[in-house]
Amino acid sequence: MHTEDNGLKKEIGLLFALTLVIGTIIGSGVFMKPGAVLAYSGDSKMALFAWLLGGILTLAGGLTIAEIGTQIPKTGGLYTYLEEVYGEFWGFLCGWVQIIIYGPAIIGALGLYFGSLMANLFGWGSGLSKVIGIIAVLFLCVINIIGTKYGGFVQTLTTIGKLIPIACIIVFGLWKGDQHIFTAVNESISDMNFGAAILATLFAYDGWILLAALGGEMKNPEKLLPRAMTGGLLIVTAIYIFINFALLHILSANEIVTLGENATSTAATMLFGSIGGKLISVGIIVSIFGCLNGKVLSFPRVSFAMAERKQLPFAEKLSHVHPSFRTPWIAISFQIALALIMMLISNPDKLSEISIFMIYIFYVMAFFAVFILRKRAKGEKRAYSVPLYPFMPILAIAGSFFVLGSTLITDTMSCGLSILIGLAGLPVYYGMKKRKAS
């Protein structure tokens, strides 16, 4: 097993890790996606099956990464795993895409979305939405610099906060609803494509792997990582299935498809009156804020880990740990600075979508890594073994290939741009390698 002492405080326990998994996955998708998944599925049975299948594929990936993470319990997650298994080149490319485009783009997109929702809720006008988003990102930057435990407190609080409206809809929807759950969607409003339905659920489940980036700050990663990954993904899968059951008990399948992104707020209004719509709006805002905090907490650990290995310019600065807070404060500031630039001059949401193709290539490589590590350490005792081996890793690989294939067919240009983003890091990689050699 590979361990490290990077000077960061080991403050992450099971509750923090669980809320990080749940909080970084559940954003707006649980409120916005049911209509789209139902439209693609054609009927409620297939829609519920799509949510279940998406959860199973994600769980397979999570359990596979948990085995790798217990063998390489280091800060950096996916980047670190690829470097340890495939070498410095592939690790660098993975880290490059995450820190230059993917991470800051997701932080920026969530910040802008949060600002827009806050402005709409309080009637402040769209002109203030970007300012609110920037303030939120800066606030979370400061919180996570002054202590990982404070970021963890925000994560726990927002996870509980987002689960309250979800729980209300599930409980009261199943209790008070009077619709037949298993119904079909009219062909005139359906767009039958079960593959697209699964793809929509997989994107709604995305974000779970960010827990792995904090391996070096866990109190006992060998036990904690698999427990948090398994528990968190099972909870999220159950939430997604139950809220769809509840919606189908309140609204007909046709109504959910027709209402689209407004289906959940309409269902809440039917259950709780005019306050119901506000409840959902607040739930989405808290959800986005918690998701944003999880990204601010975890993405900078990749640039910190790369800087520790002298793979980035200004590595000495980026790998600096604050003497009092014991957090990678310069790495956090660097990632937030990139996110703020994207918020000001571009469309971060589109940038994150463009880079997703390369990220899934790295997912496939990480899932294959479990076979390589087992071969290297044949006969050695493992702290954790993925259950149903080799079925689970193969299932995870199949799910990732499905995402890659679907994305390649539906958005070929974005896939090409994604590859170019990865290749753009090559001059930096060879430049830093030459500098280290000299």
Swiss-Prot record:
Domain of life: Bacteria
Coiled-coil positions: none
One cellular-component annotation, GO: plasma membrane
GO-annotated molecular function: L-amino acid transmembrane transporter activity
InterPro entries: AA/rel_permease1, AminoAcid_Transporter
Record has GTP-binding as a keyword: no
Transmembrane annotation, as ranges: 12-32, 46-66, 99-119, 127-147, 152-172, 194-214, 231-251, 270-290, 328-348, 353-373, 389-409, 412-432
Extracellular topological domain: 33-45, 120-126, 173-193, 252-269, 349-352, 410-411
Outcome, altering residue 94 to S: Retains 25% of the transport activity
Record note on quaternary structure: Monomer.
Protein name listed in UniProt: Serine/threonine exchanger SteT
Native source organism of the sequence: Bacillus subtilis (strain 168)
